[in-house]
Amino acid sequence: MDLDIKEIVKNMDLKFRNIEGKKLLLAISTDKSGKVLMTAFMSEESLEKSIETGFMHYYSTSRDKLWRKGEESGNVQKIINVFRDCDGDALLFTVEQTGWACHEGYMSCFHNKIDLSTGKSTVVGNKLD
């Protein structure tokens, strides 16, 4: 018996938090090696769309809308698996990344290494073409 998408999300026992007036949770995406690619917020609707399509959808607080990762760049994230954290307010996705994950052209959004003695950051890694 196949469950509908809303029932699947309900069974995930998630705790969406009130962030900027929206019910959201944190989504972390990693590649198969475990390297963190990016973090973003998800609404219930973006989670449902991700499950339905097999590709990552997020909720942009700055644009106040749902968006499919790669809708402009073509750098999509195909879902391999997902883990829920112990509190139910964050999801960790393993994805197959097409192209780069960061909108600045880096594989990971975490390319700014911070020196804790100065607070200054240095870019590590190269931009991808």
From Swiss-Prot:
Keywords: Amino-acid biosynthesis, Cytoplasm, Histidine biosynthesis, Hydrolase, Magnesium, Metal-binding, Zinc. Pathway: Amino-acid biosynthesis; L-histidine biosynthesis; L-histidine from 5-phospho-alpha-D-ribose 1-diphosphate: step 3/9. InterPro entries: PRA-CH (IPR026660), PRib_AMP_CycHydrolase_dom (IPR002496), PRib_AMP_CycHydrolase_sf (IPR038019). GO terms for biological process: L-histidine biosynthetic process. GO terms for cellular component: cytoplasm. Mg(2+) binds at D85, D87, D89. It is found in: Cytoplasm. Binds 1 Mg(2+) ion per subunit. One of its GO terms (molecular function) is magnesium ion binding. It catalyses: 1-(5-phospho-beta-D-ribosyl)-5'-AMP + H2O = 1-(5-phospho-beta-D-ribosyl)-5-[(5-phospho-beta-D-ribosylamino)methylideneamino]imidazole-4-carboxamide. Its EC number is 3.5.4.19. Zn(2+) binds at C86, C102, C109. It is an enzyme of class 3 (hydrolase). Its cofactor is Mg(2+); Zn(2+). Pfam families: PRA-CH (PF01502). Belongs to the PRA-CH family. Catalyzes the hydrolysis of the adenine ring of phosphoribosyl-AMP. Homodimer. This is Phosphoribosyl-AMP cyclohydrolase. The lineage of its organism: Archaea, Methanobacteriati, Methanobacteriota, Methanomada group, Methanococci. The gene is hisI.
